[in-house]
């Protein structure tokens, strides 16, 4: 209950700040909205040139990429600054301030990293998703349920990646390349899995299940998933548990500015 109370308060503060500096917020919304259009524009150019991904129409690929954008943006809104906040405190030797707070350090970091600046990405994702859904045939009602289940699992994967990258910053202090690693890993979830070699498919499904971020939810909505998608969702729960445990372990290894 303490976490939810703190998170609610932090959301209110973040929203109040966005309202107070509304011009900056609006500009940020526009920039992030336009930035999220880059990926579908690339797909549009590919299909416009007469090429494409075998077995997938443009609107089906757009469905994958829009679900990927929504999942990524939602996670970034809720805790997107967790990696940078952790990196900052570790680099400056001020993580003791977090440890002195009367709540779990991980819960505190999550509660204080709500980021309205990513609302533009989220809005763009929903616009693209609506446009894609208008042009495709949903397989069935059960397909919608399966899509939602796999979508939630995809968010769990996103959270796990952020936790692991943030945990790594305790070891590799001040390494600004860590967030880039996260983005590179996530990118495998925004394309049809069939375009990758078998080894990459296995890794992206059952080791670091990034296919859940965009591909598997879209495939479920189209009625193209098998049992492997739900097996991947089970792996996502284990991946999340690993991320939480790793972050907590790295906190215990933190030595502070004088370490």
Regions found by a protein language model. Give the residues of each.
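Hydrophobic transmembrane alpha-helices and immediately adjacent juxtamembrane helices
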Residues: 1-137, 141-259
């Amino acid at each position: 209950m303490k976490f939810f109370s703190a998170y609610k308060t932090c959301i209110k503060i973040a929203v109040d700040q966005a309202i107070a500096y509304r011009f900056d917020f609006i500009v940020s919304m526009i920039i992030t909205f336009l930035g999220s259009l880059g990926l579908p524009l690339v797909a549009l150019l590919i299909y416009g040139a007469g090429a494409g991904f075998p077995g997938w129409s443009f609107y089906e690929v757009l469905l994958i990429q829009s679900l990927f954008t929504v999942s990524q943006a939602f996670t970034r809104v809720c805790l997107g600054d967790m990696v940078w906040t952790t990196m900052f405190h570790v680099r400056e030797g001020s993580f003791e301030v977090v440890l002195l707070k009367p709540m779990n350090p991980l819960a505190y970091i999550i509660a204080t990293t709500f980021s309205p600046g990513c609302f533009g990405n989220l809005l763009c994702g929903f616009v693209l998703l609506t446009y894609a859904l208008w042009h495709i045939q949903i397989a069935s009602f059960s397909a919608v349920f399966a899509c939602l289940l796999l979508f939630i699992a995809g968010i769990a994967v996103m959270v796990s990646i952020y936790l692991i990258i943030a945990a790594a910053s305790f070891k590799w202090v001040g390494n600004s390349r860590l967030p880039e690693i996260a983005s590179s890993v996530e990118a495998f979830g925004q394309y049809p899995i069939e375009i990758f070699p078998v080894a990459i498919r296995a890794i992206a499904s059952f080791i670091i299940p990034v296919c859940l971020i965009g591909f598997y939810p879209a495939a479920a909505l189209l009625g193209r998933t098998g049992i492997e998608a739900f097996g991947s969702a089970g792996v996502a729960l284990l991946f999340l548990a690993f991320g939480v445990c790793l972050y907590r372990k790295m906190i215990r290894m933190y030595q502070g500015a004088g370490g």
